[in-house]
Amino acid sequence: MDILKAEIARKRKLIEEKELIDDSKKYFKRAELARKEEEDYYRRCGYKMDKPEEEAPQSTSANPVLELELTEEKLPMTLSRQEVIRRLRERGEPIRLFGESDYDAFQRLRKIEILAPEVNKGLRNDLKAAMDKIDQQYLNEIVGGAEGAELDTQHDLKVHEENTTIEELEALGASLGNGNDVRDMDIINKVLRFLLGVWAKDLNSREDHIKRSVQGKLASATQKQTESYLEPLFRKLRKKNLPADIKESITDIIKFMLEREYVKANDAYLQMAIGNAPWPIGVTMVGIHARTGREKIFSKHVAHVLNDETQRKYIQGLKRLMTICQKHFPTDPSKCVEYNAL
């Protein structure tokens, strides 16, 4: 019994020496005892104990993402510069900070995507966005108080004047597909912008009560949506960097449209959009050896509508302009396709 009392007294004295309990504290945690014993062990062995780090002050910056310091080793740049720019612009971030390299911008995008996930991104309805934009324009004009002659044009669409006629374009169309790619792209650009202008003028000529109706707003929104869909195509045409296979197909479509051969133009459109390759998505090799039918799979025959979303949109916009061209510049019914589609 004396041995047990002596052991209890020794343990109590040890705990008091380690300052684990006092008059105000009658108990302690085993983790505290283990930490004290560990400190004593390191002290006996001659190791210097690091002082506990002070709590870091809270950041007062409005953007805590930019203050984050990556401690892990650098990862390879897995995105192209164009893709990095596109994603940064979608999030409203600057595409390059002062003194920032392409890799630094990629790392900044990576931090933003990790710590600030997109909250307003999802399945976007482009047509609804265009209609909302038109409604907002109506509200702005009402609040601004348009008077007089402005009331007749307050619901009009923007018209891009090309200062050309369909007869001039038909004359230019005779030289399409003769090997001059720069000239072909200029003609394609003129024709598409001319058709957008014809469409906008037709919508602007409607009565005001028709423009205000649901169907009228839908037609205006469709025109605005088509114009936004075609903007990437116009950009490629201006910079003369349209891919050769897409350029060849669009050249055939425009040529047939100017000749008012709308059935042939529709066939060329389907050839470009859907294609007729054995594997239309672009699977050209399933093993290490070439197959007998592989030489039939060219980029021209691949379904471009499956490549990416941007390409799908301007291909869809091109189809709408084909319908507008057929509606405003008719020909024999045997050469028309879905005459009353739009």
Swiss-Prot record:
Main subcellular localisation: nucleus
Protein name (record): Pre-mRNA-splicing factor 18
A Gene Ontology term for the protein's cellular component: U2-type post-spliceosomal complex
Quaternary organization: Interacts with the spliceosome. Part of a complex containing U4/U6 snRNPs.
Top-level taxon of origin: Eukaryota
Keyword Nucleus tagged: yes
UniProt cross-references to PANTHER family, sorted A to Z: PRE-MRNA SPLICING FACTOR-RELATED, PRE-MRNA-SPLICING FACTOR 18
Role played: Participates in the second step of pre-mRNA splicing.
Species per Swiss-Prot/TrEMBL record: Danio rerio
GO biological process: generation of catalytic spliceosome for second transesterification step
Record localization: Nucleus speckle
InterPro entries the record matches: Prp18, PRP4-like, PRP4-like_sf, PRPF18
Entry keyword set: mRNA processing, mRNA splicing, Nucleus, Spliceosome
Family per similarity comment: Belongs to the PRP18 family.
